[in-house]
Amino acid sequence: MNDSKNPLSPHLQIYRWQISSLISIFHRITGIINVMGLIIICLWIGLLFFGESSYELINIFFQSYFGKIFIMGFAWSYSFHLLSGIRHLILDLGYGYEIKTANITGIIVIIGSLVLTVLMWLIGRGLI
């Protein structure tokens, strides 16, 4: 039992999420996803040395519905991490700490990552 007169912190029950904290958390998560995705891509390229049949097996995966979701997710993760990293570099220079500016740059990162993902997808499909 807590018999002290100190107030107890309600912690997460009253915490209001801010866009800056979400961008920071997702920056870390996308960094991990990017490393895992690059490992998978390196393994895919490494399968070239084991012959055409093993390489075709991975190609079948990438042409499947799940494979396309993986590629799209990896493209979004890369785009988000890139734009969020640029945002963090600007913050490191001391700019953008005002609440309004921080919210606007956070929204720019989210929308920009989606736009870059669509552009990568269109370029990859040969539509642009």
For each feature predicted by the language model, list its residue ranges.
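Membrane-embedded alpha-helical bundles that constitute the cytochrome b-like, heme-associated redox core
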Residues: 1-128
